[in-house]
């Protein structure tokens, strides 16, 4: 939960979600606005974007935009003025204000939840207070963050049959404020076969009913639901947009921001986590590892494995991602030249050394081993055994190449 305490400082930026608060994604924003402005709005949209791409913030901002635009189309009241003349009342965007605070009566939210006690059949509204707080504070968070936020610990989240029935009930009601009734369903991957209860409603919804589904993994969404939705694909955030946001919101230097943006590869959640460990000198740790593998021998290798094993899973994964990032940049350096690399001076020098140390096939083989290691860390592998095994594999991958100290 320290991660959530750390992110409190972004609250002032993202408390009310509008398109102006979104990091990058200008092409997607324009596409969404044109859907509404040109009356081309499908009744069911599926936003698909990887973790940290901003798919959820975009969906939140879009729902606010829809209700604000529908208010503009309402007739303006004409009343008698103070002296008997006609007076036109200025329209107040009350609905947009409610939507930006996540309390609009016509915008309903659905998301994975857990039973509060044994035998419960939980629905999303049981956690609506926590949900509003979560999306105000951590709009770029993932489902793991959300489940930890509500105290799930090791419990699995789910969108239940009871929740599907509650969705059907909510959307059968008459709208209160807006022309539209909106259901924003986050992580439809957590809909099991009970999601089929929603098929008829999605296919033939009541008039002016809008479904907005937000997913990370298209392959895990029920095909029957997928086929009934218009897809909106959210790409990873552009490197420059990520760096700009880190400078403006997290007060990083431009060099720090570019380094973190490069490693996070368009995942803003990952970028925020990397800020927590910005003081970690991954480059020195990597240099020690490679020298232990190629030059110093078994004693140095065991010492290094002891060091990395004490860091904890999150730091271990970040270290592996950093090494993978440098390997990818090294390959780009070979093929594209220095001017196209988002690297600091020290990282560029290190990438050049990696190119002297390994050829492309070796770099690709190392990247595969690092990916496997990250996969096993996610599944609670023994860190000492894992990193010792990777150390041995690195030696055999590079063994046929001339040994160069990574100074």
Whereabouts are the PLM-identified features?
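Charged, glycine-rich active-site and insertion segments that engage polyanionic ligands
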Residues: 18-99, 207-210, 216-407
């Amino acid at each position: 939960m320290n991660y959530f305490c750390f992110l409190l400082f972004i609250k002032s930026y993202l408390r009310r979600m509008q398109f102006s608060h979104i990091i990058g994604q200008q092409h997607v924003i324009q596409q969404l606005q044109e859907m509404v402005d040109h009356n081309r709005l499908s009744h069911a949209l599926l936003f698909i974007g990887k973790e940290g791409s901003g798919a959820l913030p975009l969906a939140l901002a879009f729902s606010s935009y829809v209700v604000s635009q529908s208010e503009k189309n309402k007739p303006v009241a004409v009343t008698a003025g103070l002296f008997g003349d006609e007076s036109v009342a200025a329209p107040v965007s009350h609905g947009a204000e409610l939507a930006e605070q996540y309390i609009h009566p016509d915008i309903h939210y659905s998301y994975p939840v857990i039973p509060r006690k044994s035998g419960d059949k939980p629905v999303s509204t049981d956690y609506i207070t926590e949900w509003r707080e979560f999306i105000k504070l951590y709009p770029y968070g993932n489902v793991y963050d959300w489940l930890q936020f509500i105290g799930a610990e090791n419990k699995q989240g789910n969108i239940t049959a009871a929740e599907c029935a509650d969705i059907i009930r909510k959307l059968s009601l008459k709208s209160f404020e807006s022309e539209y009734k909106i259901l924003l369903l986050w992580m439809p991957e957590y809909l099991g076969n009970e999601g089929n209860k929603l098929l008829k409603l999605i296919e033939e919804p009541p008039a002016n009913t809008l479904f907005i589904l937000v997913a990370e993994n298209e392959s895990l969404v029920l095909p029957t639901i997928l086929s009934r939705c218009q897809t909106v694909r959210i790409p990873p955030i552009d490197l420059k947009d990520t760096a700009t946001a880190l400078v403006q919101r997290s007060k990083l230097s431009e060099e720090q921001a570019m380094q973190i943006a490069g490693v996070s590869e368009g995942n803003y959640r990952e970028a925020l986590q990397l800020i927590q460990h910005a003081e970690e000198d991954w480059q020195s740790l990597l240099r020690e590892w490679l020298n232990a593998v190629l030059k110093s021998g078994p004693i140095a290798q065991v010492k290094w494995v002891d060091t990395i094993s004490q860091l904890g899973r999150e730091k271990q994964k970040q270290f592996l991602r950093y090494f993978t990032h440098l390997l990818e940049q090294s390959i780009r350096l070979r093929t594209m030249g220095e001017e196209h690399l988002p690297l600091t001076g020290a990282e560029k020098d290190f990438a050049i050394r990696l190119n002297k140390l390994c050829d492309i096939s070796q770099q690709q083989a190392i990247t595969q081993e690092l990916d496997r290691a990250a996969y096993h860390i996610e599944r609670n592998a023994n860190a000492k055994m894992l990193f010792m095994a990777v150390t041995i594999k690195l030696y055999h991958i590079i063994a046929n190449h001339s040994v160069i100290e990574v100074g």
